[in-house]
């Protein structure tokens, strides 16, 4: 899975530690493979479909339709086809990599069409692909069973401009909010009120069909109103909330966006549906994979190798460079005091950090987390430590790399000149952070992790390996 593994590993005594960090990353991503997890959650026996414990008699429906999208859409749809075969009448899903097959056993799709969109900024081809999804939703009636694919990344991959809004309006607003460091909840509050699909609108479009959603969660806490901007879930945000988000992050949107939000706040545009709305009476959504899925697999690998696993949290959030300081402090504390766990140990965390763009470089939350950790860590450069921080979809912040593998030797202070690969001066690291160019610095140090699209998305995964010989300066 990690394409540049050999370049990431050195020939010194730390190679086993670095190798374990990469093994843990791979195990976490593979555990969240949508084909695998959906195959375990879905079963068809004697004409009855069971999804995560809920049963549906296929004889009660005249048509079975698959629709939706996201980074994990292909694997999810493939598992549904493997289970139901020709019981699926038609379908369409949208993803950023239509050829993605993270699980070698996942079959090519036959009943469901895969269409391409773009992430993290929506595109025209995404709009065209989403129209097909909405056509299927609009055609559903009370005799239809809709199997809805709701996975991380669908907020951008399924753009459906509401009312008179244009794609350009959505693009400009999305780019500005991403650059501002807005949280996913705040970003989605705006998205939901500018979309004909998000914030429960897809549930409205499919009603009165029976809808079974399968969600691969990429959000902290697995809030179904946030995953993919909650197309099948009640929305408790309002047009007024969306306006406050823009003000909070000092984002000046296109006039059409501002006009729509203003009219909505005045009650001239209908709000997104809330809990108790009839649109949700025949809708159920099941989370089949999340950050916990990946973290559990990492912990198992650690135990197998004789390292005690310690989960910090599956809900780490906030500025990436600030969150990195806590992980640096833990790495320093463990060898000195045995707290919060005695080495050798693997400290792991998930969640979703953000980056407030300060310059014109290239980077993402996991790259910035890794670079900030390497700059902040107060440990001997020869300490037996390694940190891998990746986005499980294989693309951190739209950079084309998954994240980075770093150690206490990655950044050296003045007077200890960089020598060999995997070395950066502290000045270079600080300049890169100031210019939001964590990728540039880490790529030069041969520290960027390259996986390509993984076909899943359960957000950030961080693995800190602390060996027995680690020690602070």
Where are these regions (language model features)?
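An N-terminal, well-structured beta->alpha segment
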Residues: 1-67, 75-76, 82-83, 312
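A glycine- and small-aliphatic-rich helix-loop capping segment at beta-alpha/alpha-beta transitions
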Residues: 81-87, 106-113, 161-172, 207, ...
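Glycine-rich oxoanion-binding loops at beta->alpha junctions
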Residues: 94-142, 191
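Gly/Ser/Thr-rich active-site loops/lids in small-molecule metabolic enzymes
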Residues: 165-183, 235-251, 359-387
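A glycine/threonine-rich phosphate-anchoring loop and its flanking beta-alpha core
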Residues: 178, 185, 189-251, 440, ...
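Accessory alpha-helical/coil subdomains and C-terminal extensions
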Residues: 235-324
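Active-site segments that bind and position negatively charged phosphate/pyrophosphate groups
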Residues: 292, 296, 300, 304-384
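Internal helix-turn-beta structural module
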Residues: 363, 370-473
């Amino acid at each position: 899975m990690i394409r540049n593994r050999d370049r990431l590993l050195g020939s010194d005594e730390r190679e086993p530690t670095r190798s374990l960090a990469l093994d843990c990353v791979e195990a976490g991503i593979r555990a969240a493979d949508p084909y695998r997890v959906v195959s375990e959650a879905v079963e068809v026996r004697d004409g009855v479909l069971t999804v995560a414990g809920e049963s549906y008699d296929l004889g009660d429906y005249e048509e079975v339709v698959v629709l939706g999208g996201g980074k994990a859409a292909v694997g999810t749809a493939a598992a549904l086809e493997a289970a139901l075969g020709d019981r699926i009448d038609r379908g369409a899903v949208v993803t950023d990599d239509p050829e993605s097959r993270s699980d070698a056993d996942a079959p090519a799709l036959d009943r469901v069409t895969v269409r391409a969109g773009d992430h993290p900024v929506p595109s025209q081809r995404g709009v065209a692909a989403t129209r097909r999804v909405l056509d299927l939703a609009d055609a559903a009636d009370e005799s239809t069973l809709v199997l809805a694919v709701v996975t991380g990344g669908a907020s951008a991959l399924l753009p459906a401009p509401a009312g008179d809004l244009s794609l350009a309006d959505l693009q400009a607003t999305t780019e500005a909010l991403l650059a501002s460091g807005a949280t996913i909840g705040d970003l989605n509050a705006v998205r939901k009120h500018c979309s004909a699909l998000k914030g429960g609108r897809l549930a409205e479009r499919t009603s009165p069909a029976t809808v079974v959603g399968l969600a691969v969660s990429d959000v902290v806490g697995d809030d179904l109103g946030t995953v993919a901007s909650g197309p099948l879930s009640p929305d408790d945000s309002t047009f007024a909330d969306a306006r406050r988000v823009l003000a909070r992050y000092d984002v000046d949107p296109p006039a059409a966006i501002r006009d729509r939000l203003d009219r909505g706040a005045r009650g001239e545009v209908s709000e997104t549906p809330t809990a108790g709305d009839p649109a949700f009476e025949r809708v159920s959504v099941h989370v089949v994979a999340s950050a916990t899925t990946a973290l559990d697999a990492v912990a198992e690998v650690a135990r197998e190798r004789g390292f005690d696993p310690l989960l910090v949290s599956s809900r780490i959030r906030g500025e990436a460079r600030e969150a990195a300081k806590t992980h640096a402090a833990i790495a320093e504390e463990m060898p000195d005091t045995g707290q919060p766990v005695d080495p050798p140990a693997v400290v792991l965390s998930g969640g979703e950090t953000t980056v407030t763009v300060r310059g014109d470089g290239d980077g993402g939350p996991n790259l910035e987390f890794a670079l900030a950790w390497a700059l902040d860590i107060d440990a001997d450069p020869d300490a037996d430590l390694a940190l891998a921080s990746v986005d499980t979809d294989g693309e951190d912040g739209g950079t084309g790399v998954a994240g980075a593998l770093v150690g206490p030797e990655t950044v050296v202070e003045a007077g200890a000149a960089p020598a060999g690969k995997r070395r950066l001066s502290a000045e270079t690291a600080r300049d890169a952070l100031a210019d939001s160019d964590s990728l540039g610095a880490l790529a030069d140090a041969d520290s960027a992790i390259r996986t390509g699209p993984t076909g899943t998305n359960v957000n950030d995964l961080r693995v800190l390996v602390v060996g027995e010989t680690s020690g602070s300066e």
